[in-house]
């Protein structure tokens, strides 16, 4: 028989306040409950010791406290001196799953979180897009990806914790803005047991212009990364079908406004794909796109996925592309892909442990 109780973690923070107020409780009571759920990570109302016994009983009657869990972990084999990337299969309360990636380095621990189960945008180079879309993640499910990774890091060393977070996992975060905003508010609450600063959080998007404006107006001042991959309209649309909804000039204008508002450079992510976007003219187009606003370019190699006939560029072609950008005075970083051997690199997340391997749906 299905459980008729409501998942209390499905509420945003404001919804929780409204719900607790409807029970005749003061507003601060909801904040106490929220702290128990997300800072102390309790799974039993009886452990909420500063909540009255009568309210604990009422909450137990109405609600459940589900938690996400690790279903599987894959660790990339690397040299002893290099930290290994780990990919976690995270089970959700309704038996759906997402993937979360931990990318360690000597001075930080970056967690790459998912924001949706699957993705509706069908980017042609991305395994997640071939899965199709199931649903948005709750704010709690985003937060718990960080909690789970923190727990795993603590097992390895008591002083370890997540220092940076990127919304670059499964899904398009700007299609789930309310839950993404709520998760960020929780994770950056300085009175909670996290050590995350908003300045260490990056949201990656394919470039949904109305939502970029909403993010700019939110006051969160989060760093923004754009999956650009081509500065030619036709080429970009062939890689990112939703790009047909707005011109590159409209996107550029939105990014210019965002950078001006948050006083942070926008990162233009450009994945080099052999014979697709690696020509001299492609480099020139990218230079032109990047002119006139605060931005930097991250070049990354294409990471191969099942049933997709793209290939990474050869080293000589990549070096020529980089040389063209540098000679034009463009700020460019060549980002080394981590996690490719365990299908945890950019574009490779596709729930393979759940037998949802990438296959073309169209």
From Swiss-Prot:
Keyword annotations of the record: 4Fe-4S, Cytoplasm, Disulfide bond, Iron, Iron-sulfur, Metal-binding, Methyltransferase, rRNA processing, S-adenosyl-L-methionine, Transferase, tRNA processing
GO biological process: one example: rRNA base methylation
Residue numbers binding S-adenosyl-L-methionine: 171-172, 204, 227-229, 303
Assigned EC number: 2.1.1.192
Residue ranges of domain Radical SAM core in the record: 105-341
Annotated binding of [4Fe-4S] cluster, by residue: 119, 123, 126
Catalytic residues (UniProt): 99, 346
Obligatory cofactor(s): [4Fe-4S] cluster
Cofactor binding remark: Binds 1 [4Fe-4S] cluster. The cluster is coordinated with 3 cysteines and an exchangeable S-adenosyl-L-methionine.
Reaction it catalyzes: adenosine(2503) in 23S rRNA + 2 reduced [2Fe-2S]-[ferredoxin] + 2 S-adenosyl-L-methionine = 2-methyladenosine(2503) in 23S rRNA + 5'-deoxyadenosine + L-methionine + 2 oxidized [2Fe-2S]-[ferredoxin] + S-adenosyl-L-homocysteine; adenosine(37) in tRNA + 2 reduced [2Fe-2S]-[ferredoxin] + 2 S-adenosyl-L-methionine = 2-methyladenosine(37) in tRNA + 5'-deoxyadenosine + L-methionine + 2 oxidized [2Fe-2S]-[ferredoxin] + S-adenosyl-L-homocysteine
Family annotation (InterPro entries): Aldolase_TIM, Methyltransferase_A, RlmN_N, RNA_MTrfase_RlmN, rRNA_lsu_MTrfase_RlmN/Cfr, rSAM
Intrachain S-S bonds: 112-346
An example molecular function term from Gene Ontology annotations: metal ion binding
Family: Belongs to the radical SAM superfamily. RlmN family.
Name of this chain's protein: Probable dual-specificity RNA methyltransferase RlmN
This protein's encoding gene: rlmN
